[in-house]
Amino acid sequence: MMLGLFLLGRIFVLHKRYATVIGFDPGAQIEMVSILSWATPDTPIRESFYGYHPPLGFLIPRLLHLAGFSPEVSIQLVSFVASLLAFFFLRMTLRHIRLLHSPSGIAFLYITSSIPIQISVSTSVNLDVLILAMGSAVLCASVHLLWPSESFKDQKNQCPLPLRFGWSDPVIRERRWNAIIAGCATVTAIACALLTKFSGILLLGIPALAAWSQPFERGWWKRCSMGAVACICAVAIAFPYYYGRYYIREGRFIPLNTEWTAKDDIERSIVKRDEAPVRFLAQLFQPTAVHAAAGPTHTDYEVNRLSDAWRDLWIRNQWTGDTSPKALRVGLLYMHLFPWLIIAGGLFFLERIRRKAPWTRLGWIVVSFSILQVLALVQYIYRIPFAGYGPAKGLYILPTVWGIGYLAVSAFHDERLVPMRWRRHIPFIERALVGVVAVFVAINHAIPAY
């Protein structure tokens, strides 16, 4: 039922926005789809605004363009399919660790996949939804590779509160053929991400986190070695391209277009940053007055603020279009409610962090990877400190929705939240919580709240 509601919601959003161009730099991406081909996948790096990106994110919609679709619709359809792949790969991960049919797994899957920015990227012009889909594929493949399915007991007949799990560490690995398939899938997904956008480099952290968080007492080094080999193979596939196209021509492996399109502004911002680097970093974590003065849809173009990136997860940036009053009210509710859920869920997660239950160890991966995403955004802003360029975008850290959804669910994860005299009503609480998640999915797709 929930799956049907989710898919109908996605189809409804696609129907409503079909052939509508939404995005931060849609013209630049459309241009690359029009001029690149599989025979000539590169252009001079500085010739086009998006010419510095790796080519795969443009070549995939190019296939649809060759089939007769316009570049805009081709990109939109690729975004739609990528958003569904991100959902189904995450679903496969939960199925593998036997959480798919648990209340926690249901809530995590559908809350994470229905956060407003997730719905937005499913029909907009962007490359980041491809990175999210590939990241979800890497997570799925890494867990299949490093966490044998025999490790997990059947999790039927669970209550939403409490959610406790147990297992035994199997001595026998999965069949070798399954491990080979999972390893090849991990390598392929990471390599594709590296050839889609520079942020794909961060996906190398997922196999490492999966190996680090594995709950088995034996075989730890073996699993870490398997994860490391997968990452090395993926880097080996992408390295010749990075070396030949970027390092030889630009003198660095990751050139950014703002370094030449806004060179003077960047240099002035770097000088100002270097005068007080601690103050610069502190300002990132301070709230912006622009949201109160001009409205929450507006971005602070004077000082870089991570609060703008947080806003982007829930409310449309005015740069990409207008926001309806209903969508704004719903987005503001989420924007102010979820920090409290994250704090509460984080406390419960830290209390149980040493447990070897699959829910806890999944949290090790998704929470750590979300933190890694935020740290990478801070590093990016520090390198490109010109606030007028708007580097603090939530779109750049799209996989953080995993950590947000996980911690939000963890906020309701402790049986101590339920008074003793009410615990006989846990089956009713279970249905009520699933109903709340269904309402969340329906509202965000029906408005949609972005």
Language model features: what each stretch is:
Residues 117-130:
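Short acidic/glycine- and proline-prone juxtamembrane loop motifs at membrane-interface regions
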Residues 73, 90-114, 132-133:
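Transmembrane-helix signature of polytopic, membrane-embedded enzymes
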Residues 74-98, 137-140, 344, 348:
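Transmembrane-helix motifs of polytopic, lipid-linked glycan transferases
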Residues 1-26, 114, 193, 231-247, ...:
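Transmembrane signal-anchor helices characteristic of membrane glycosylation enzymes that use polyprenol
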Residues 9-15, 27-52, 56-59, 63:
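Extracytosolic helix-loop segments that constitute the early lumenal/periplasmic catalytic or substrate-binding loops
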Residues 141, 147, 151-154, 162, ...:
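Perimembrane helix-loop-helix junctions
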Residues 51, 55-59, 67-88, 121, ...:
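Loop-to-helix entry region of an early transmembrane alpha helix in multi-pass inner-membrane enzymes
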Residues 226-342:
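Membrane-lumen/periplasm interface segments of specific transmembrane helices
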